[in-house]
Amino acid sequence: MGYNKSLRYSRHDGTTCVIDNHHLKSLGAVLHDVRRKKDRIREAEYEPIIDIADQYMVTEDPFRGPGKNVRITLFKEIRRVHPDTMKLVCNWSGKEFLRETWTRFISEEFPITTDQEIIDLWFELQLRPMHPNRCYKFTMQYALCAHPDYVAHDVIRQQDPYYVGPNNIERINLSKKGFAFPLTCLQSVYNDNFENFFDDVLWPYFHRPLVYVGTTSAEIEEIMIEVSLLFKIKEFAPDVPLFTGPAY
């Protein structure tokens, strides 16, 4: 029996029998069309926002913005942290800070030797477990706008903390909005009077952080804490001369 075009349609009303592939489409093609339609709708929503956003320049990470990063490592210390509790990292009261199990002070002199303008100040915390094969995460809580006369507790209970970032390193930006740091030779102030360096030089222009760290372990853990301050310095001149030769 040959092909008869009239056989494509059933004699029963409301039903259709399709013989050729002219009206058929694969399910993958249908889903692809739906996805493209959603993409076009999403692009149409963002077009006016993108036109405005293109007028501004921002950095992906403020830490990687313009300027030179100068690190000063304050101390390394081993602390014992109990389960479900968090310990204060640094109380900013003189060079003793919070000495516990073992403490080593790193930077004896300030690494910046000339008058500089500080753009940003970062509090960097590096945490490491002291015993191998320990499966727990580091937790953290901090406050920036505490009253200067507030006396922080050494130990607090964990309540809704967040996990420390990748590689167990966390950075906190201490910059105050609307406060410009003056040109200062920080090395002389740091070396002359370390105890008053923070209260007289840093905290009037930057936040004084109260940082607590803990673990998710159910046992008492010994952790290594390394505390550093990262100064982002505005570079007025390059570190190396632009020209070399007998005339310079």
From Swiss-Prot:
Cite the entry's keywords alphabetically: Viral occlusion body
Q: Does the keyword Ribonucleoprotein apply?
A: no
Q: What Gene Ontology terms describe where this protein resides (cellular component)?
A: viral occlusion body
Organism superkingdom:
Viruses
GO terms, molecular function: structural molecule activity
Q: What single Pfam family name could you report for this chain, choosing any that match? A: Polyhedrin
Tell me, in a sentence or two, what this protein's role is.
Component of the virus occlusion bodies, which are large proteinaceous structures, that protect the virus from the outside environment for extended periods until they are ingested by insect larvae.
**Family statement:** Belongs to the polyhedrin family.
UniProt name for this protein: Granulin
